[in-house]
Amino acid sequence: MEENLADNSEREARPSKTKRKKEMHALQNIGESLVRLDSRRLIELGLPDTLMEAVLEAKRMSKHGALRRQMQLIGKLMRDVDAEPIRKKLDLWGNSSAESTARLHQLERWRERLMADQQMQALSELGQKYPDADLQRLRALARNAVKEKLANKPPKSFRALFQELQKIIPAATGERPGEGID
């Protein structure tokens, strides 16, 4: 009877096989993320030598079976490493990429509005939000970009308009054109 109690308490202290497998798959997924990173970011993580070598080896592999086995090895090596700082760093890099993409979309929306029929409204909104903006230059660039598009010419002013908007609109803002105006 006492042996059964000892066995039960030992089983409760140990995670179930399913839970262990989920943890191993999570570590292997982190390993897959490591393989997709560029070398500069890998160095920034400061991984142990054995793990770094395994990741670099996986980057060179092209055969599916060999790559799968290498990913399992990386998952196994990840067990000996504290994965939380690596996970946090990967999340941080993923979010910064998403923020960068969101900013580019925001700038593209402004450019499209400036080139559309509602140009005067868009210019007045830009003038209210960003008083330092050179509205006359933006209007000229937008007008030239529309002319280039209609004439099927290279999009020189189209690009220049985007670059001018990048200078005017700070990176920290995430608003959409037309939002936030009272």
From Swiss-Prot:
Name of protein: Dual-action ribosomal maturation protein DarP
One Gene Ontology CC term in the entry: cytosol
Stretches the record annotates as Disordered: 1-25
GO terms, biological process: assembly of large subunit precursor of preribosome
Molecular function as annotated in GO: ribosome binding; rRNA binding
Signal peptide feature range: none
Gene3D superfamilies on file: PSPTO4464-like domains (1.10.60.30)
